Structures are given as structure tokens and as C-alpha cells.
Amino acid sequence: MESQKKFARTFSFEFFPPNTPEGAEKLAQTAKQLAQLKPKFFSVTYGAGGSTRERTLRAVLDLRSAGYAAAPHISCVGSSRNDIRDILKEYQTHGIRHVVALRGDLPSGTAASGEFQYANELVAFIRSEFGSQFHIDVAAYPEYHPQARSAQDDLLSFKRKVEAGANSAITQYFYNTDCYFHFVDECEAMGLSLPIVPGIMPIGRFSQLARFSDACGAEIPRWIRKKLEGYGDDTASIRAFGLDVVTRLCDDLLAAGAPGLHFYTMNQAGLTTTIWQRLGL
């Protein structure tokens, strides 16, 4: 963890692009609430196969017009070089200089296509086309990507993204600090030096969390899963327990030298704000 201690702490919040006017209004209110915590930026996700391209752009521009720093996600699978070039030029026109570069997923039932296969190819393309004009975040997987052939293959995949020109990384969420510490140590052993910011998923609804975790390969430790299952439909108890677990997780990460936190907010301000207040940030 020594390499992470030298980086300034950054805090950020992630949104998904709304698909209704009501959702857009709700996101505006959520952003206004979370902006009071003075994050470095808000990020906005990008749907499978670029399915939310226009909505992601609109959400990012709305955040910018409200005076907030925004970083759009860009996924490359299913896209051509011209597609990516056009997207980045559009963001550049609007003064956006920070992107989160991902491989991404194709919509269910769709065959692989496009001119990119891996995220490192996207990072390399951005650098070749735009030089250092964009700050590039990439994804990191302390518990390893669910499609990785092995732990070593996944580490090498991350290394290629860094060597292609990534500035920093945001991890998939996790609830076991040891996996993050071990991942950072392995990155240090490979000579990688960049901020690796832990991704944090507040716990609000167990069914939703279980579904997300099964899909993305994030492990819910057995003791946490059993406690949450035991609460059944008792939402208040789930939230109270989740706040305790995630606050402790964040506290331990920051105490060990993590260079900030990136919250997956699900377009909700409440849980993230409460965790923030409990941490005394």
C-alpha cells in the first residue's frame, strides 16, 4: 500500500444516465445534494454497446451546466474508431477533459463486433488521437474480472491498460479490504504507480445488491450475505447494517492509505451522504 499513500485523496460519485424527464430532475437534485460534499467529479455510466450514448452525453452536459466537473464513461466493444473519435471530439468541444475508458459489454444476445477488443486498445487509441488532452481512468478488479482466465491474466490486462496511458484507476466494489490491499501490492510488484481508488457500493436493498454482485463478480462475504438474508424485507435493518459495514470498510481503506473513494450512488444521495458524514470527511 505504500505507493498509494503518496497520491492526493480524491472523492467522486457515479451516476447512470436517466431515461425520463422525471429521472433527469431527480438526478439534478441528487447531484445538488452530493455537490455539497465537494467531490472532485461526478462520473456517468455508458450502457452496453453504447446504448445510452446520447443520454450519457445529455447527463454529462447537464452536470457541466450546473457547474460540476463530470467524467463520462466510454466503452469500446461494439464501436469503431470513428465512433470513439466522434464521441471524444464532442466531449472535447464541451470542455470535458476526463473520461473513464472501459471495454464494456454488448447487449445480451448480441455477437461481438467493432474494432476494439480490450480496454487497453481504447486507452492507446485515445492517446494516439488526442495525446494528453484527456485524463483517463480505467477499471481495476481486486477480486478479478469474472471473464478473466486467471488472476495473473487479469493483472496483466490491468498492466496493459496502465502502460497504454491510463492516469488512474477505479475499482469494482468489494467488501473485503484484503482483496484491495493484495491487488495494490501486486500492482506495486509489477512496477505500476498510479492512484487506484476503491469503488464503494452502499447497501440499501439486498436483492439488488445480490443481483449486481452475481453479474459483475463482486463477492459478498458470507457473514454479510447471511445477515442481510436474515433481515428479509426489513429495509430499515438492512440499511442500518449496511451503513455500519460500508462506513467501517471506508474507514479502514482510508486509514491504510487508499487515495480516495468512488461511490456507486445508484442516483441516490442518502446512503452516500450518511456514510460521508460518519467518516467525518
Regions flagged by a language model, labelled:
Residues 32-45, 163:
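Catalytic domains of carbohydrate-active enzymes, especially glycoside hydrolases
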Residues 21-34, 56, 81-89, 150-160, ...:
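Short, acidic/polar
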Residues 41-52, 74-76, 100-102, 167-176, ...:
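Catalytic beta/alpha-barrel core
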Residues 2, 22-25, 50-62, 80-87, ...:
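Active-site-adjacent beta->alpha loops and helix N-cap segments on the catalytic face
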Residues 10-26, 48, 70-82, 135-153, ...:
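Active-site mouth loops of central-metabolism enzymes
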Residues 1-13, 20-21, 25, 225-226, ...:
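N-terminal amphipathic alpha-helix/helix-capping segment at the start of soluble metabolic enzymes
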Residues 22, 114-141, 190-243, 248, ...:
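Active-site pocket-lining/capping segments in soluble small-molecule metabolic enzymes
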Residues 14, 42, 91, 161, ...:
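Conserved, mostly hydrophobic/aromatic
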